A protein has these predicted regions:
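Sec-dependent, cleavable N-terminal signal peptides
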Residues: 1-15
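Polar, low-complexity loop segments and adjacent catalytic/binding residues used for recognizing
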Residues: 11-234
Length: 234
């Protein structure tokens, strides 16, 4: 398939799901507002799902981009809310998908760069409510491993500041060719101060001028719905 030359995507404007490739447990459906909504995993045990652009996106030499999306993590299981989701740039292909559980549907996808939104503490995690940068399908977080305000989020239903609290969260991710910046807000569309800014050479990691862009998520013994809406990428 040809690469998308104009580096601009707006999920609400998509008229056909052919613009996105859906893998594993993921589905695309019409939300309450009439626009497309991505369900990466249902609230069931042992799920893994991903959604990527069907065609690769052509970047400039520095991989400069900005993206905004909203997510909700709802209906946590008896063992707790788990496991989380990632936003990913990768060159493996539109059908890329890793394992479930703590692998978040991301482990093993390489070459790649991801921003992780993690809601379950595995042995390699700092806590059960953090954001991190991942590369090349490896789940050992790069620095900074940044907790978001609240820790010990099990169970987290209704707890402000826990990413799995069922609220609508807004996410801004920007890359200027040198620093990857991430900001998130609970129940707000006003951008706060950056949660993290991390120096990283995405062009060198991916090794080519185009990449597939999208999301992954996973559940284990614990589970939750992982839902994405209002995604804009440019």
């Amino acid at each position: 398939l040809p690469a998308i030359a104009a580096c601009l995507l707006s999920i609400p404007a998509f008229g056909a799901t052919s613009d996105l490739t859906v893998n594993g447990s993921a589905k695309i459906f019409t939300g309450p507002g009439g626009g497309p909504v991505i369900l990466l995993t249902p609230a069931q045990q042992g799920q893994a799902g991903s959604v990527f652009t069907t065609s690769s996106i052509v970047f400039d030499s520095t991989y400069t981009f900005a993206t905004f999306f909203q997510f909700k993590m709802t209906d946590p299981g008896y063992y707790g809310a788990s496991d989380g989701m990632t936003f990913v740039l990768q060159t493996e292909g539109a059908s890329a998908l890793g394992a479930n559980g703590g692998d978040l549907g991301y482990a093993g996808i390489t070459p790649s760069v991801a921003v992780e939104f993690d809601t379950w503490q595995n042995p390699f995690d700092i806590n059960d409510n953090h954001v991190a940068i991942l590369t090349n399908g490896q789940m050992n977080d790069l620095d900074p491993k940044t907790p978001y305000g609240v820790t010990n989020c099990q169970p987290s239903t209704g707890v402000f500041g826990c990413m799995s609290n069922g609220d609508t969260w807004s996410v801004w991710i920007d890359y200027d060719g040198t620093n990857l910046r991430v900001a998130i807000a609970d129940n707000s569309t006003t951008r706060p101060a950056d949660l993290m800014s991390y120096p990283i050479d995405i062009a060198s990691i991916l090794g080519q001028s185009s990449a597939f862009v999208g999301f992954t998520a996973g559940t284990g013994a614990g589970f939750e719905n992982h839902v994405i809406a209002n995604w804009i990428f440019h």
